[in-house]
Design a protein with these regions (language model features):
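Acidic beta-to-alpha connecting loop that harbors the catalytic carboxylate
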Residues: 82-84, 116, 197, 379
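A catalytic-pocket lid/entrance helix-loop region that shapes and gates access to the active site
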Residues: 1-31, 82, 101-146
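Accessory cap/linker subdomain of secreted extracellular hydrolases
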Residues: 1-71
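Short, proline-enriched alpha-helix->beta-strand connector loops that line the catalytic pocket
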Residues: 70-76, 107, 187
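C-terminal, loop-rich substrate-recognition/catalytic regions characterized by aromatic stacking residues
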Residues: 26, 128-420
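Short beta-strand/loop motif that positions the catalytic acidic residue
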Residues: 78-80
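Active-site-adjacent bridging/hinge elements
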Residues: 52-69, 110, 114-125, 270-276, ...
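Conserved alpha/beta-hydrolase "acid-adjacent" motif
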Residues: 85-91
């Protein structure tokens, strides 16, 4: 946004970058100034996004406008991946493009959503870290772009992969499906309810994901800006070959934000090592396959003793062998839940309905025998905390209570597709 190139020398030394930010976070000093001291291009354009992160109309200037879409006649080929940390923006812009462009332009355009991470959207490798997909997931994307341009500009045959407006690779089924729109990919909704249990409700003593609502004890956890145990995990490297690989970065590090964003789909540390900063729910083994295609949602009621808190939701498949595979996630600053650019502060001690309605797009067949796992936790890390200019010494910890009576049991909505 500052019309400058990415600082790959700075961004590429991930271990050093994490250490610099962690030092400032631990001291309670400005991470913005730490970034500036490390050589990052911190200017007014960057600070605009740091100081005004509220989603809403304030971000409208970065988007192409309806009249701009309506005026152009150029088709597009948009490529992203289920584990691409930029998939949210890519898909949002595609939907905006479809809504405001002419029918003729849309008819000649395509969206491809593979199983890839961000680097995979350049080269189409059929794996993300330890997660390996079937042979059809490997696509020569440079050749696809070349052949599509020849098709659009010179009338050459359309690439075989682009047989429908939207092409989705459904992991687990390991096949491509074509649909006329993203919305058409979801045929139904599977609803699950979360039930609390007595105890810490961590990964080893979790609550339940069930087929019907039921009474259970409320779940309580803490969002403490002074608790740096999650940040300490981010100082540790991922085992060689296990995390996301990029020619622009060195040894992959544990990274909360990138894990939530999808780039490290087999990393479960930020769920397993909650340390009282969140709660976990696990289902019984599925009796039938569940093909999740679309945007999940989670609706719950909570009470907080502070006017705000930052929360993350992580949805995983746990295979019969115990492997963890990310399905989707969401991040929410509770005061920004209206997405209107403003803040609606929580009333401490008052029960508030909260909807997590901006999950990442998911496209995966969860096989019978696997389990669903949902983690709700404090969203704070080296790269995302509530005090980028320095943490006040008296910054309060928030105590969050999720209600679990049957009438207000948390409700998980899973969009499903029928591929059989």
């Amino acid at each position: 946004m500052s019309n400058r190139g990415t600082q790959f020398v700075i961004a590429g030394d991930v271990a050093n970058w994490h250490a610099q930010l962690h030092e400032a976070l631990a001291a309670g000093t400005s991470q913005v100034e730490a970034a500036r001291a490390a050589g990052a291009p911190v200017d007014d354009d960057v600070l605009q996004f740091v100081d005004h992160p509220e989603p809403g109309p304030g971000w409208e200037f970065v988007y192409a406008q309806p009249e701009q879409f309506a005026a152009h006649a150029v088709p597009v080929l948009s490529i992203t991946g289920m584990y691409d940390d930029s998939s949210g923006g890519t898909i949002a812009n595609w939907r905006r493009f479809v809504a405001h462009s002419s029918d003729d332009v849309v008819a000649r355009s395509h969206l491809v959503v593979g199983p890839w991470d961000h680097m995979g959207t350049h080269f189409g490798e059929g794996r993300v870290g330890e997660l390996v997909f079937g042979p059809d997931a490997t696509v020569d994307l440079p050749a696809l772009r070349r052949d599509w341009l020849r098709h659009v500009l010179d009338g050459a045959p359309r690439p075989d992969l682009l047989r429908d407006r939207v092409m989705l690779h459904v992991a687990g089924s390991e096949r491509w499906i074509g649909v006329p729109s993203l919305e058409a990919a979801s045929a139904a909704t599977a609803t699950r309810w979360l039930r609390g249990v007595d105890g810490p409700m961590d990964a080893l003593h979790s609550g339940f994901v069930e087929d019907a609502p039921a009474d259970g004890p409320d779940a309580v956890f803490t969002c403490d800006p002074h608790d740096l145990r999650t940040a300490a995990i981010e100082l540790q490297p991922r085992p060689e070959g296990s995390g996301p690989q990029s020619p622009f970065h060195g040894q992959p590090m544990n990274n909360f934000i990138m894990t939530v964003a999808g780039n490290d789909p087999t990393n479960s540390r930020f769920v397993v090592e909650l340390d009282g900063q969140g709660v976990v729910y696990t289902s019984a083994p599925l009796t039938d396959d569940l093909v999740v295609v679309g945007w999940p949602e989670l609706h719950l009621h909570l009470e907080c003793d502070q006017p705000d808190a930052d929360l993350a939701v992580l949805l995983h498949e746990i295979t019969p062998g115990g492997d963890s595979i990310m399905l989707s996630s969401d991040l929410l600053r509770l005061s920004c839940r209206r997405f209107d650019g403003g803040h609606e502060w929580l009333v401490p001690g008052e029960v508030t309905p909260i909807g997590f309605e901006h999950f990442k797009w998911c496209q995966r067949r969860v096989r019978a025998g696997s389990r669903l796992r949902v983690a709700i936790r404090h969203a704070s890390s080296i790269q995302a905390n509530a005090y980028p200019h320095g943490r006040p010494a008296d910054a309060p910890a928030a105590r969050v209570r999720i209600l679990h009576d049957a009438a207000r049991a948390p409700r998980l909505l899973l969009p499903t597709a029928d591929l059989d």
